[in-house]
Amino acid sequence: MKKQRCPNPIFSARCPNPIFSARCPNPIPSEVNMNIREKYEQFEMEHLSEYASKALLSKGRMLHEPKCEIRTDFQRDRDRILHSKSFRRLKHKTQVFLSPEGDHYRTRLTHTLEVSQISRTIARSLNLNEDLTEAIALGHDLGHTPFGHTGERILKKLCNEFKHNEQSLRVVDILEIRNGKPGLNLTFEVRDGILNHPLKYEPATLEGQIVSISDRIAYINHDIDDAIRGHIITNIPDKFLKHLGSSHGQRINTMILDIIQNSENKNSIIMSDEVATLTTELRDFLFENVYYNKIAKSEEDKTMFIVEKIYEYYTKNFDSLPEFYVNIYNNNNFSKKEIIKDYIAGMTDRYAMKVFEELYIPKPWL
């Protein structure tokens, strides 16, 4: 099936500013006069694959800003994401299992870090831009809701439309504040990779394609690992053990190696037909036996109720939202529904439960 570009109205695939052209009109300075950033940029131009994205040739940012003397544009984007509030909140957002009692289950933050590790391994092996890859990986899930995909589904129902990838872009473009201004002002390449990371879309760069496929590798394998630890399943079917590997690490290694072998010196990131088919079948096994099991379903109904009641309250009491969100509404052309969605999507699991309690659970008054 042919992949498509994500049709997000807040994202322009082409920057109209001529200073952001794909070809840099400025020659690389002589090495004697180079600062640290320029040496990085020269190294990328001379040593990375012809298919790699180069910081010097970036299409640039929506708002022009002075260059850093030490870091390339992609390195700066990575750091801006890493230091953002939205990134820190990922540690208290569900990956699959809601508020597990054990300390070793994945959260949305640990998932993000595993995607980053897998992505960087592939990018380095293919001689692509590791900094760009890391920035996209760290930012790809910033827009995820509390309570995992359950939260996403109920917000989609309530708002008629919600996609976590589009919300992630909205976070870095609007909701994060940097130097007193909305948005992190990231480069085109990072924004494109964040928006188009779901596997049905096609990022503009190979680095973005790496994150897209690494996201699937990460969640399939770590969700199996967590499901076995939580006694939801005892193991996976024999054919996956035989062809992909008998351990968590072996399966990840098989998938990564297959991608590297099939993508080397090519302008696309692909798996072999055999491993791609097995990966898809393993994902189907997860949906049937883990994501939609009876225990998960019972907890899912509770979390959907929490999100639905919070949304219902603020549609009737919009001015009760935190001042930050009311100000966004007053200073922009967004609907109240969009602002309420922004507020709920940014919540952690425990904050959503706290808000629900404050709104609906009576407190002793004597």
Label for each model-derived stretch:
Residues K93, H144-G151:
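Short, conserved acidic/polar surface loops in the N-terminal third of protein domains
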